[in-house]
Amino acid sequence: MKRIITLTVVNRSGVLNRITGLFTKRHYNIESITVGHTETAGVSRITFVVHVEGENDVEQLTKQLNKQIDVLKVTDITNQSIVQRELALIKVVSAPSTRTEINGIIEPFRASVVDVSRDSIVVQVTGESNKIEALIELLKPYGIKEIARTGTTAFARGTQQKASSNKTISIV
Amino acid sequence: GTNVQVDSASAECTQTMSGALMLIESLKKEKVEMIFGYPGGAVLPIYDKLYNSGLVHILPRHEQGAIHAAEGYARVSGKPGVVIATSGPGATNLVTGLADAMIDSLPLVVFTGQVATSVIGSDAFQEADILGITMPVTKHSYQVRQPEDLPRIIKEAFHIATTGRPGPVLIDIPKDVATIEGEFSYDHEMNLPGYQPTTEPNYLQIRKLVEAVSSAKKPVILAGAGVLHGKASEELKNYAEQQQIPVAHTLLGLGGFPADHPLFLGMAGMHGTYTANMALHECDLLISIGARFDDRVTGNLKHFARNAKIAHIDIDPAEIGKIMKTQIPVVGDSKIVLQELIKQDGKQSDSSEWKKQLAEWKEEYPLWYVDNEEEGFKPQKLIEYIHQFTKGEAIVATDVGQHQMWSAQFYPFQKADKWVTSGGLGTMGFGLPAAIGAQLAEKDATVVAVVGDGGFQMTLQELDVIRELNLPVKVVILNNACLGMVRQWQEIFYEERYSESKFASQPDFVKLSEAYGIKGIRISSEAEAKEKLEEALTSREPVVIDVRVASEEKVFPMVAPGKGLHEMVGVKP
């Protein structure tokens, strides 16, 4: 099962190495990592998307992460009401003849063209991972030259709804 | 450099000094008694400040010897072992010891030299990314970037190594950091927001445990090294007596509960007693204290404690639920938790039937061996002699393998902190240097290193340290001219294909000892043991005793890998 785990860590050298090493040591697969500064100086936020076997693995992973001296807080936010976003840059083969057509495709995704060359364009899209995948699928027939994805970054919404089932798939 | 020689008692205000001197002053602040170390290029500035510092430095003959000695010292004294090694190969020679200390939760503060900051990352001479190499086997690690950070880092390192679940902390010091001067102060507050080990148990869980005990019919305590790390053996005894709950030990827990106590069931696990293993198999309440359900203890998990409610007391929350589904998780320090449980003074369980059953098993299935000298001098008998001649009061250090299991089985410990063994990692070559560390921690104790002829040859160069310091360590080599446990498994599981487990040649260990200036004696029979062993073990000088034991003897009882504890074989002659 896929889990989204966020960590706040003291931004010291080696902290990321320790954490990713821990994943290797305990045999967990990382799908993506994002790291960046937080509102507090010297504290970074790391968002992991991981694949684990079951609840027990999540608990063990969370506890092992918590044991790290430089880790301040570990939260498995998968079942919370969350905002999760990923950014992708997609270089699509595009002759002038197909450019309008592609624009028509990306528009509902609120994606934008951020670079144009003679035979390709670069599309920038942000959103949840499955939205990005949907767009990639639609662009595939034109020929994708390159994709760069940031991986998911996420945190809990300010207001938590009760049931986890009423999570809406937002395309915005 | 213009170094200010600072009296450690008066260095309250800040002083300017080199990183190397800061290190020395910090160690004094931490009241370090001795350092186990080995010099080299990158730590020259540190060793220069060590000179005339008044700190005791033990020089082993290999860095691995230094760190295992520090482990032995830590295990026996309860204080952190301090190690220094140079960069590159000096540092990488520590890796086995770090892994050993990590898995057996021993507090170490390890300093490694590093090449100068200006050349880090350039594959400089004797450069190794020791932080990267040791991350999975250290509780925490640091690389010092500027001398001012050293005191803070050292203070944190000692705190982290010795609190919570103890473990090794590594501090990597680039050569220039040791030379550059900075402001020294050791008064700063510790600021580790991400490190706050839980020591006080949750009251609700304590109540649940008290109730579980009162309603149990077949309770048992499994006590591990956490009892020793928490200095809680007195509390364990009081609790077990108050509640009348029988106690089994893990390998590393031995000594935490007196072996001759009527409630003691022996060691559990792969080569544990029938009674301890059946107790874990049949119990309806298993209270694990400072143990981590190692596979060598549990056997096949499908069968382990299959009808039992599990209560798990551990200072490391990550151990709870890691292996066993736990109904009563108690995170806390073993001593504090046991004190709280004793204070509760709950109702005892109605377990007279259970205790009758356990007593019957104890009577029916004691540890055994066939005392037949035609097969050679039995190693179990040798351990019994060692026990007899040291009055059961020695500190015993071992490697891993058959000799370790026989020591665990036939040297019953009455007291805590007498047993120094490599449990989790199973490190050959651990016993001899660990015995040196133990002897340095307990100068008046009788320290016996029980080793195999295989493991002995991995770290025997440390005999020179024994000679140099005239430590009265007794090295008993259970010499069967093979890797006994490997041989045993090959005999049982690999149809007697003894692939590379028998040594085709062997040095003369007596002459070897003499070459080191240490008395060496050879014992080849029970008669010789009776004649020579007592004197050798009770003298106050170092001795190496080469004992030729029956080479085909196997360790029993045994739980084969993949089997449940109840499926153990070799429970009777």
UniProtKB/Swiss-Prot annotation, chain A:
Domain of life: Bacteria
UniProt GO cellular component terms: cytosol
Reaction catalyzed: 2 pyruvate + H(+) = (2S)-2-acetolactate + CO2
The ACT domain, residue ranges: 4-79
Gene3D superfamilies per record: 3.30.70.260, ACT-like. Chain A, domain 2
Enzyme Commission number(s) of this protein: 2.2.1.6
Keyword GTP-binding: no
Pathway: Amino-acid biosynthesis; L-isoleucine biosynthesis; L-isoleucine from 2-oxobutanoate: step 1/4; Amino-acid biosynthesis; L-valine biosynthesis; L-valine from pyruvate: step 1/4
UniProtKB keywords: Amino-acid biosynthesis, Branched-chain amino acid biosynthesis, Transferase
GO-annotated biological processes: isoleucine biosynthetic process; L-valine biosynthetic process
InterPro entries registered for this protein in UniProt: Acetalactate_synth_ssu (IPR004789), Acetolactate_synth/TF_NikR_C (IPR027271), Acetolactate_synth_ssu_C (IPR019455), ACT-like_dom_sf (IPR045865), ACT_dom (IPR002912), AHAS_ACT (IPR039557), AHAS_small-like_ACT (IPR054480)
Pfam families membership: ACT_AHAS_ss (PF22629), ALS_ss_C (PF10369)
Signal peptide: none
GO molecular function: acetolactate synthase activity; acetolactate synthase regulator activity
Family, as annotated: Belongs to the acetolactate synthase small subunit family.
NCBIfam families assigned: acolac_sm, PRK11895.1
SUBUNIT field: Dimer of large and small chains.
Protein's recorded name: Acetolactate synthase small subunit
Gene: ilvH
